[in-house]
Structure formats: structure tokens, C-alpha cells
Amino acid sequence: MRIYKTKDYEDMSRKAANVISAQVITKPDCVLGLATGSTPIGTYKQLIERYQNGDLDFSEVKSVNLDEYKGLPKDHDQSYYYFMYTNLFKDINIDLDNTNIPNGMEPDSDKECDRYNKVIESMGGVDLQILGLGHNGHIGFNEPEEVFEKLTHCVDLTESTIEANKRFFASADDVPRQAYTMGIKTIMQAKKILLVSGEDKAAILRDALCGPITPQVPASILQLHNDVIVVADEAALSLMD
């Protein structure tokens, strides 16, 4: 595991974009595992800038997203498809047919999870998986559980996750109660993982990287992966020995 300490959010975003850029340059037809949320927005802005400057070409890149709310259509302004389109896809030359996100409008959970697992498998897996870190240690929507969930599955969101996401909706009642998410096994099968974390995650980042490996802290499983890059600011790393 390699840990890069950065000065602030802008520096963190730049270093994370460096890792992604290197992946795209060395393997133009790579499969990127993408994440949503506030943390990667700065990284995506960096990638857009590099594309617009002629330094990156996404024309052959394929992408798979970690998760999607169940029950939200693609054009809903809080769907993760909408997030990816507005924060990255529309401003780079990626082929939208090569972008993959769980279908939140598929009511049959088993059917959609099986379809998404097959999509990832058909691509040969993920070359670089980008992850954010939830306050309770979740990655994707893999919440603290008694066991590590393996493949893509439908989850009931915890109250803490609903609370964290309600700022994006009119009220907490409007936050979806379920989501489709890649499982821990799928994430761990990525050839390389990039974990990006900001200042308000110091305690959980310490627990994830230095504490016991437990499904109660889903991100702790990353300690077992052989190629993890952590990019975090000084505040996020302040509790690390």
C-alpha cells in the first residue's frame, strides 16, 4: 500500500488525477471503476482540464460505476448516472456506450445484479478502481455488516448513509432506501485501487488502514489488496502513526 499525503483538497485532486492519467496513457483501452460523491469532483475536473489541453484521450476507455440508487431514473438530478454525465462524461471524449452504471429502474434486483456482474466480467475486470470512503467505512454502498458481501447486490441503506445524503435531496424522506452496488469481491478483483479521502475522515481512515480487518469497517479489506494507492490530505492522515 502506498500512501500519498497532500496539502489540501486541490493537491489531493491533482495527485489522484495523476494516477488515473497514468493508467489511461499506459493502457488507452483500460477499464476504469468510477465513484461518485463530493470527494472525486476535483479529480474529475482535473481530468477534464487535461483532456481539453490535449493531454488525455478517453476514446477507448471503458468505465463501470460502483453503485446507483434503486428507483431513480438516469435523468434524475440525484442519480449517479446524472452525476457522472454532468461532472465528467459530457466534457471528455468517452464513448457513452462504453460507460456502465447499474440500472436503478430495474425492479428485479437479482436480474440487475447478475447483468452487472456479467458486464464487468465481459470486460476482463477493472484495471483501476477509484474509491471514496464513507464516514462509517463503507466503500460503494457496502455498509458495515456481519460478512463481506461478494458481488453486485442490492442493499438497504443505513440511517447514517441516508442522513449523509439527505443534503442532496429536498428532505430525508426523498432519499432512496436501496441501492445497487458492486460487492467487496468485485472491488478487490480490480488490478489497482485508488482510495481518495478528505479531512473529515481521519478516524475512519485510520481504522480502515490500520485497524482489524472486519466487515464492520468494509474498507479495512483493502489491507489485503496487493496494489492500493491512498491519496489523502494532511488532516485525513493526522491520526495515523
Describe the predicted segments one by one:
Residues 4, 72-78, 82-86, 90-241:
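Conserved phosphate- and dinucleotide-binding cores of soluble alpha/beta proteins
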Residues 34, 63-65, 194-195, 230:
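Structural beta-sheet core signal
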Residues 31, 62, 127-128:
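Structural motif
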Residues 17-25, 48, 52, 85-89, ...:
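Generic structural signal for well-ordered alpha-helical scaffold segments
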Residues 1-32:
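N-terminal glycine-/serine-/threonine-rich phosphate-binding loop
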Residues 26-52:
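Glycine-rich N-terminal segment of FAD-binding domains in flavoprotein oxidoreductases
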Residues 56-62:
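A glycine-rich helix N-cap at a beta->alpha junction
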